């Protein structure tokens, strides 16, 4: 099922003066339709999967997909108005067939025989979209497309194929829609955060003198996967940025006495990525490292106080930067102190806790608040947690303490 709040989508589209969204990015397609866009999206070109979301909340969502993906889309989203195009993959329903002649009959019966394209035919896809727009009375409408994704060559072809449509950038509307999560999305992000945190526990247990960075990464991954399996779900992906010691880019680093260990990690559940970080050491750290981490703790607390509905993302950045200034860091400057999380292309999603960002914090957003410091010759330190914004404030999805933990004392 779609994760779009159709009432909110209607409001945002009316404010943007558009009559529909037409979405081409695979992740946006899945968000709108509730099903994967199919293998023909692998080249990052527009057309093989298209979602049409009318501004009218009562009008059904429609989609253009490949014949290869059609059955999966129908099962996942039976209410979608679906149009299909042929791609290169030959597939036929052989139910009941026992001979080669019956195989040929099956092709004819299912209308799946005949020539197929090298990949997919963009013009055919745009033609199916034109049919949908004509049937919905949108052939000459002002329509928003996700131009932040769409390749320039494909957009040029789209405008040539549908010249009467007033195409505008619908990306801001899509971003605002995706920033507020559905209940399903929130649950996926909770699971992802829990798995990543279980991985941190496993990683911490593997830290000892001589332990290699690669081994810590493997321990984290194993712990995250074990938690997911035990909890009855699977991971669709994972990532980690772990640093050990004073050389930030030394991927062959090993744990030594006094070494700082920073683990910025996330797992994906059904395409939705968590984001969190903790800092550790093996043995006492230098006075400078202790001072830096103390400042990060204060900045994190200052930012967290501001994560309330009605405040701006920029206000969080201002609070954290002001805290660092009070701690004596007059030159330190982060471009952002965190961001939304979800099921988009990257780990970090808009909106960001950045300077003067006027975007309003809303209930239902899931965000990652981060306070990092990278010091070549010292090491990396970071605090990051994931929060659900509620009407009362911010609910943390993590449980590990935010301290700089000396693992030699564990």
PLM region spans:
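Active-site neighborhoods and metal-handling regions in enzymes and metal-associated proteins
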Residues: 1-410
